[in-house]
Amino acid sequence: MSEEIKKIEEVAEQDKAPKVPTTEPPVDVPAPVTEEAPKVEEAVAEIAAPAAAEGETATAAAAAPEEKKKSGGVARRFTFNKRWGKHRDAEASTPKEPEAPKDPKEDVLGWIAQQIPQAVHKANYQVIDWVQKTAIPEEGERKTIPGKDQATTRNQFIGFFKDGDVLAKLANALEPGAVEVAAAEENADAAAQKEVQKKNIDAFGAWAQKTLGTEAAPVTNEDLLEKGKAGYTAVFQTLWQLGVQAKEKFDKEGFNVDTIVQLANSVVKSGLLTTILGFFRRNRQAAAAVEEPKDETAAAEGAGEAKEEGATGEVADTADEPVAVKQETSAPAAVAAN
């Protein structure tokens, strides 16, 4: 009986209407925005950073071909150079003083550096000529000096003294018995001949060191046999000093420095004159080439007039008369000028 009463009470409680709330519901108060804003900005920055990096990479990759085309494939970083702008203009406006001419007696290498190649070739020939005349008294035993118009190039100059024989003879001519001349055996191979050349060159270099008072040998076999044109300076300077001091030290006739300087200067003047004449000659040939088409046009017009006269019948019958043909040829410009 009691269980039934409990069930009836439970059903009655379920059927009751809910109680009306006597208090107001809680209100949600939003948090201040200022505190969360930095976090949002940081999050946005973190998200945007990879995207920006990818965008920059893509832009750089797209611009790379254009930069390579402009700079030839080499990326260059601009650096400030003081030669730009006012500094550059100031340097350009400042006239440079011409270098004073060197005295060949005191600084022959400086003098050589100031000369044009043709003038140096003239000096080379004169030095070889003095060496041969001093070292080999008999004219028939002398070798032919290489070069055209008494002008010897640097390579020819080195090649002339490469065997060392003339150098050893020069030392003995200036100071008898100074150098023992080595000679190769008959039918000796190239290696044996080269060893003989080295001995003669080194013997001459040792004698020149003692004679000129230098710290080391002024000429070595490498200067003549290995270095090529790079050895020209040492050989030329040594022979030049011997030629200048020959009279003082050995009472032998040396070469005249003033004569060599005059020959070099004459080459410079003649070279300048040749350049000027060539300029006017080219202009005259160009003018003659322009005038030739006019002469051909006039001849063509004359031939056309003759054809018109024959067509109109103004020319009489000339079947029984010999016809004289006049051939006009345009003479060359040089002949016309003469």
UniProtKB/Swiss-Prot annotation:
Keywords attached to this entry: Cell membrane, Cell projection, Cytoplasm, Membrane, Neurogenesis
Localization: Cytoplasm, Cell cortex; Cell membrane; Cytoplasm; Cell projection, Growth cone
SUPFAM superfamilies, alphabetized: Calponin-homology domain, CH-domain
Compositionally skewed regions (Basic and acidic residues) per UniProt: 1-18, 87-104
GO BP, sorted A to Z: nervous system development
Low complexity: bias regions: 50-64
Membrane topology: Peripheral membrane protein
Entry-linked Gene3D superfamilies: Calponin-like domain
Subunit structure as annotated in this protein's UniProt entry: Self-associates (via CH domain). Interacts (via CH domain) with ced-10 (GTP-bound active form); the interaction facilitates the localization of ced-10 to the cell cortex.
The name this protein goes by in its record: Calponin homology domain-containing protein
Species of origin: Caenorhabditis elegans
The encoding gene: chdp-1
